[in-house]
């Protein structure tokens, strides 16, 4: 091989190596530039995402801040309302203490007047005794002067005559005192009763059997009725109350003899109107909420009544029953208002006679507690009240005050007599009671009681002013055939046990629901 060829080969190798180096360097630089560009894009994207995340975090923090502020403001409002309520209670308690202070002051003044009167009478008696002694001395001197009597004989004669004169005067004074005491006692008794009535004055409103619910517009009537009347039937079935929808503008009338049911229907209907969604499922939900809300309202009524009367440490169940009295009527009187009035009158009478005022008020408030219970048996409200007060460990004085309302049970304490007296005072004042309404409600209650006595009946409602009884039965115990027989049996029982005008329609309702959930 020649030298030039070797040199050319070496040169070619060197050129190839140098060219490959620079070619590789160029490719590496291009890759490096591409990597830098990609890194810059990633960095920019990361910055962008970081800015977005920062903004979202700031927005979320602001929302949390607003939400927390709203919760704090709501809690502050609730606390302010609670503080205001406590302040109102303290004000009421101060007013009660002021009234008691005035009563004690009047009683003290009365005792002072009696003391002054007794002191004057005592001075009068001492004066008359001195006059009698002076008369005896004068007679003794006269007898000794004109008669030949010894001193002992004269003394006996004078004493005998003085005794006769004093006995006559004493009898006259006793008769005058008895007559004065009789007149004073009668006047004091009248003043005491009038004072008790005035100091315990309570507004009495005769309950009716209807409640009016105001509508925002007349278009709401059609929504309440629903397609083919489904909504109104559902509401009537769940509450046992008649809904009367007529030409009265923007109003629906709820008719039923039970004020508790009417109140449930009213609350549920008002919630449905406010919500705007009226259909059977929503109606069931609102009726359940209304019942729960009414239970809370009943408890608050009982607590307010016991607080106003200064009665403490009463069993919570008894407090709820006291609240339920607001939805019971007796001879046209609101039972809670009547019981509060009786409690106040009993307290006033007990204070005048020196009895335990708090115990007297307690007995007066609970004297009709049996009317608040759901009567599932044939016991009278007096027997039921005795059982309830014994169950919740009330004083024997309270139990006897309830029992003494029955003629066959004697009052065993002064407080029991005072409760009976206060009950009569509250019941017999003009305009306090209405017997016709009481008898009407008793007939409706009897209709439901007859229906509920049959096996398989879940509950029943007397509606249409007693012209219809709707009986809801348990579908697992009453078949369609049994429902026909049950309606006939209830009809015959009503015909045998009740006197009523016109006809009574018996409607037996059997409803079967099958529910499955698709997952």
From Swiss-Prot:
Residues 92-124 are annotated as: Disordered. The keyword Transmembrane applies. One of its GO terms (molecular function) is RNA binding. Endoribonuclease that initiates mRNA decay. Belongs to the RNase Y family. Signal peptide: none annotated. Its main location: membrane. SUPFAM superfamilies: Eukaryotic type KH-domain (KH-domain type I), HD-domain/PDEase-like. InterPro entries: HD/PDEase_dom, HD_domain, HDIG_dom, KH_dom, KH_dom-like_a/b, KH_dom_type_1, KH_dom_type_1_sf, Ribonuclease_Y. Residues 335-428 form the HD domain. One of its GO terms (cellular component) is plasma membrane. Residues 92-120 have a biased composition (Basic and acidic residues). PANTHER family: RIBONUCLEASE Y. This is Ribonuclease Y 1. GO terms for biological process: mRNA catabolic process. The chain crosses the membrane at residues 3-23. Residues 209-272 form the KH domain. Keywords: Cell membrane, Endonuclease, Hydrolase, Membrane, Nuclease, RNA-binding, Transmembrane, Transmembrane helix. Its EC number is 3.1.-.-. It is a single-pass membrane protein. It comes from Levilactobacillus brevis (strain ATCC 367 / BCRC 12310 / CIP 105137 / JCM 1170 / LMG 11437 / NCIMB 947 / NCTC 947) (Lactobacillus brevis). It is found in: Cell membrane.
């Amino acid at each position: 091989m020649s030298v030039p060829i070797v040199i050319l080969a070496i040169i070619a190798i060197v050129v190839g190596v140098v060219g490959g180096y620079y070619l590789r360097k160029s490719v590496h630089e291009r890759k490096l530039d591409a990597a830098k560009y990609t890194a810059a894009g990633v960095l920019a994207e990361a910055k962008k995402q970081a800015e977005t995340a920062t903004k979202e975090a700031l927005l979320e923090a602001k929302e949390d801040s607003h939400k927390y502020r709203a919760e704090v403001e709501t809690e502050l409002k609730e606390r302010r309302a609670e503080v205001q309520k406590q302040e109102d209670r303290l004000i009421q308690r101060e007013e009660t203490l002021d009234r008691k202070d005035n009563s004690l002051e009047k009683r003290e003044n009365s005792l002072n007047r009696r003391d002054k009167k007794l002191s004057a009478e005592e001075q009068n008696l001492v004066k008359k005794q001195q006059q009698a002694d002076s008369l005896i001395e004068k007679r003794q001197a006269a007898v000794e002067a004109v008669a030949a009597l010894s001193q002992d004989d004269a003394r006996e004669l004078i004493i005998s005559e003085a005794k006769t004169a004093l006995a006559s005067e004493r009898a006259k004074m006793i008769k005058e005192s008895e007559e004065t005491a009789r007149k004073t006692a009668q006047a004091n008794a009248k003043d005491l009763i009038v004072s008790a009535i005035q100091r315990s004055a309570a507004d009495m409103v005769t309950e009716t059997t209807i409640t009016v619910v105001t509508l925002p517009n007349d278009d709401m009537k059609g929504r309440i009725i629903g397609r083919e009347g489904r909504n109104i039937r559902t509401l009537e079935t769940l509450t046992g109350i008649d809904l009367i929808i007529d030409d009265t503008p923007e109003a629906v009338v709820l008719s039923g003899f039970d004020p508790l049911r009417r109140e449930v229907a009213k609350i549920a209907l008002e919630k449905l109107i406010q919500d705007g969604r009226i259909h059977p499922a929503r109606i069931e939900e609102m009726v359940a909420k209304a019942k729960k809300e009414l239970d809370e309202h009943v408890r608050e009524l009982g607590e307010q009544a016991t607080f106003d009367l200064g009665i403490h440490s009463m069993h919570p169940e008894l407090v709820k029953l006291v609240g339920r009295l607001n939805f019971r009527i007796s001879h046209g009187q609101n039972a809670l208002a009547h019981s509060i009035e009786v409690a106040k009158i009993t307290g006033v009478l007990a204070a005048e006679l020196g009895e335990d005022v708090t115990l007297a008020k307690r007995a007066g408030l609970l004297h009709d507690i049996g009317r608040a219970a759901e009567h599932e048996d044939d016991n009278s409200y007096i027997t039921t009240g005795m059982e309830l007060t014994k169950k919740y460990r009330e004083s024997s004085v309270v139990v006897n005050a309830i029992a003494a309302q029955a003629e066959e049970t004697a009052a065993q304490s002064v407080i029991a007599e005072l409760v009976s007296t206060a009950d009569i005072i509250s019941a017999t004042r003009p305009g306090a009671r209405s017997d016709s309404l009481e008898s009407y409600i008793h007939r409706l209650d009897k209709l439901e009681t007859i229906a509920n006595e049959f096996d398989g009946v879940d509950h029943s409602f007397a509606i249409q002013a007693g012209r219809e009884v709707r009986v809801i039965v348990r579908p697992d115990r009453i078949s369609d055939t049994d429902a026909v027989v049950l309606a006939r049996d209830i009809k015959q029982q009503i015909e045998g046990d009740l006197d009523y005008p016109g006809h009574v329609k018996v409607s037996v309702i059997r409803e079967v629901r099958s529910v499955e959930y698709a997952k």
